[in-house]
Amino acid sequence: MIVTPKFRGFICTTSHPVGCEYSVMNQVEYIKNQKKINGAKKVLVIGASTGYGLASRITAAFGCGAATIGIFFERPGSKNKTASAGWYNSAAFEKMAKEEGLYAKSINGDAFSNEIKQKTIDLIKKDLGKVDMVVYSLASPRRTHPVTGEVFNSVIKPIREAYTSKTVDFHTQLVSETTIEPASDDEIRQTIAVMGGEDWSMWMDALKKADVLEDNVMTLAYSYVGPEVTHSVYREGTIGKAKDDLEATAIKINENLRTIGGKAYVSINKAVVTQASAAIPVISLYVSALFKVMKEKNIHEGCIEQMYRMFNDRLYSGDLKLDSKGRICMDDLEMRPEVQNEVTKLWNEANNDNVKDITDIEGYRREFFRLFGFEFEDVDYNADVDIEVNIEGLY
């Protein structure tokens, strides 16, 4: 099948198997070209198929030489429908890990469920005994509670009052004003249930009870703070409330892990292009301006560069450089005052006439397409490709 990008709103409904493999290969090569990290050896990544979760798995495997188990919920390909990008990413990762002689197995299913938690515990016991690192990097729009059965849906909305701001449609490159109505109390509650810390805590409880955590285990979850311009819709909005809950959960997990010397951290990561962030008005314009400034200053990072820096310079360097709230700050380059001042200036100036020139909207658009395996110069998109790809180590 010849695969081209197809869209439904902000969602790209197709993905390219060869392009996704090429993307993973680039990330693997980046890590293999860095100095080795004396770090984790047996790693569980919950949410391992895209973005920061995938980059964490690649860094652990190819940077630390770790055995990895990845949990994700992805769609395989069929005769006439491509798989989701995360499926192709995971297939490529497993293939490359195997070639390198690294242990890699994956479980495809709902990480929020008790069933997948148990399946993961069984696999750890069978193959690894215990794990010394657990990365929690789930990005899901909904969650079925494993105890009550309630289905929660997350929303990206401001709280208390409507928010009006500039945004840019990266398909048309048109700047416009958008207004987002505030969330109801129930929408806030549901967003916290999906994107807060409860499931992370449930995972760590289950893993500890099953005795599959090594002494001095480390667990990480990822968050974002960002600048003032995004706060109404992000940090002070519904997602921010969920992230507050996630950060509070780290304290609870620390208590729980104390008996085995374990530690839980939240890492505040930088803004990158993800399927999730593309759906947030305001973020696309902010990230386009941020890319422009950080690339000019030669401090731009994607997921993989950032995860290597986190593992090498923070987690296993002996100095986590925690902030006053006990968080790891990987947004340090993004939040430099000189970067933010320039980004704010570009933000204020951006309009339909100049957005292509003063921001990196083109770079943002290309990054978005690359999430699905498109727009890589070295991939032949006119070639007929097999869209049914197996993941070798699926358990």
Swiss-Prot record:
Family: Belongs to the TER reductase family.
Keywords linked to the UniProt accession: Fatty acid biosynthesis, Fatty acid metabolism, Lipid biosynthesis, Lipid metabolism, NAD, Oxidoreductase
Site (Plays an important role in discriminating NADH against NADPH): residue numbering on this chain: 74
Identification of the protein by name: Trans-2-enoyl-CoA reductase [NADH]
EC nos: 1.3.1.44
InterPro entries associated with the record: Eno_Rdtase_FAD-bd_dom (IPR024906), Enoyl-CoA_Rdtase_cat_dom (IPR024910), FabV-like_NADH_b (IPR050048), Trans-2-enoyl-CoA_reductase (IPR010758)
Top-rank taxon, per record: Bacteria
Keyword Transit peptide appears in the UniProt entry: no
Pfam families: Eno-Rase_FAD_bd (PF07055), Eno-Rase_NADH_b (PF12242), Enoyl_reductase (PF12241)
Originating organism: Ruminiclostridium cellulolyticum (strain ATCC 35319 / DSM 5812 / JCM 6584 / H10)
Pathway of action: Lipid metabolism; fatty acid biosynthesis
Subunit and partners: Monomer.
Function, as annotated: Involved in the fatty acid synthesis (FAS II). Catalyzes the reduction of a carbon-carbon double bond in an enoyl moiety that is covalently linked to a coenzyme A (CoA).
Active site: residue positions: 234 (proton donor)
GO biological process, one term: fatty acid biosynthetic process
